[in-house]
From Swiss-Prot:
GO BP terms, alphabetized: translation
PROSITE patterns found in the cross-reference section: RIBOSOMAL_L9
Family from the record: Belongs to the bacterial ribosomal protein bL9 family.
Alphabetized UniProt keyword annotations: Ribonucleoprotein, Ribosomal protein, RNA-binding, rRNA-binding
Residue spans crossing the bilayer: none
Record's protein name: Large ribosomal subunit protein bL9
Function: Binds to the 23S rRNA.
Pfam families the UniProt entry points to: Ribosomal_L9_C (PF03948), Ribosomal_L9_N (PF01281)
Single GO term (MF): structural constituent of ribosome
Species per Swiss-Prot/TrEMBL record: Alteromonas mediterranea (strain DSM 17117 / CIP 110805 / LMG 28347 / Deep ecotype)
Record Gene3D superfamilies: Ribosomal protein L9, C-terminal domain (3.10.430.100), Ribosomal protein L9, N-terminal domain (3.40.5.10)
Length: 150
C-alpha cells in the first residue's frame, strides 16, 4: 500500500515521503495515529497545500523537546525513596512510571513512555543513568538515585 508520511517514522522515512508499507501496518497503526494518509491523487494535492504548515508543526515539536532536554540537563539528577531491605534490595521495583513521576515532581514534564529502561525495572538502591527519549531526534540522560526509605 502506498502512503504519504505526515510525521517522521523510524526506519521508514520523514515528512512527505511516499513509501510502500504492508496494508495492515498502515490501517492499524499509521492511519489511526495520524502519521500517514493513503497516497491517492487527491491526498497528494492536499498534502502539498499543507506541507509548510506540517513542517512548522514538526519544527515546533522539536524545539519544545529541545527546551525540555535543556531543563532535564539543568536538573541533572533526581532522587527516589523506596522501601528496601538491609542489603539494598528493594521491596518491589522502580519502573518508568516512578521515574517519570519523580522528574515531573522536580519540575520537568515527562511521560512514562519517554523513559527508557533497556534492562528492565530497577530493583536495588544506587545511582543509575537513565535515557529519556523526548522526541525521535532528542535523547537526553538523567541520573536517578534510589535510596532506602527511612
Amino acid at each position: 500500500m502506498n502512503i504519504i508520511l505526515l510525521d517522521k517514522i523510524a526506519n521508514l522515512g520523514g515528512l512527505g515521503d511516499q513509501v510502500t508499507v504492508k496494508s495492515g501496518y498502515a490501517r492499524n497503526f499509521l492511519f489511526p495515529q495520524g502519521k500517514a494518509v493513503p497516497a491517492t491523487k487527491d491526498n497528494v494535492e492536499k498534502f502539498e497545500a499543507r506541507r509548510a504548515e506540517l513542517e512548522a508543526k514538526i519544527a515546533e515539536q522539536l524545539a519544545a523537546a529541545n527546551a525540555r532536554a535543556e531543563k532535564v540537563a539543568e536538573l541533572a539528577e533526581v532522587t527516589i525513596a523506596a522501601p528496601a531491605g538491609d542489603e539494598g534490595k528493594l521491596f518491589g521495583s522502580v519502573g518508568t512510571r516512578d521515574i517519570a513521576d519523580a522528574i515531573t515532581a522536580a519540575g520537568v514534564e515527562v511521560q512514562k513512555a519517554e523513559v527508557k529502561l533497556p534492562t528492565g525495572t530497577l530493583r536495588e538502591t544506587g545511582e543509575y543513568d537513565i535515557d529519556l527519549q523526548l522526541h525521535s531526534d532528542v535523547i537526553t540522560s538523567i541520573k536517578v538515585i534510589i535510596i532506602a526509605e527511612a
